[in-house]
C-alpha cells in the first residue's frame, strides 16, 4: 500500500473495513468511504446463475453445512423465513432459494453496511440510496456477467474516472 500513487484512481470493493481477519488502516478506509462510488447493477437472473456456479458445493456435497448456516440467520430474518428457505433447499428449488437469500438477506445487509460506511450516498429522511444527480453513487448496469461485459465496464469506468483527475 505504501507504493500507491495518490493521484491515480484505485478501484476497490467497499464492503467492509475487514479483509478476512485483517483490518484496512483507518485512514485508508476513511479515504475509500469518502471517494466516488459506482454501484454495479446486474439482473437478478445473472446474479443467481453466478452464485450457483461458484457455490455449487452447497447444492451437492455441503447441503448440511448450508442448513447450519441458515440456522445462524434466524436472528436476522426470523424463523418463518429460514423455514421457507429450508423448504426450498429440501425441494431443490435452487434458483428461488438463491434469489430469496439475495433479496431478503444479502442485499439488505449490504445496504445497511453501505449506510454506515457511506452515509452521504443515502437520503437522511427516506433512507433510500441517492442517485448520482443527488450526490450519491453512480450506477453502472451490466446486462450479463460475460467476460466482454466486464471488459467494457472496466473501460467505461477507466475513461470516466480518468476525466475526474
Please describe what each predicted stretch is.
Residues 1-26:
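Conserved nucleotide-sensing/catalytic segment adjacent to the nucleotide-binding pocket
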Residues 30-165:
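Conserved NTP phosphate-binding and transfer environment spanning the P-loop NTPase/kinase superfamily
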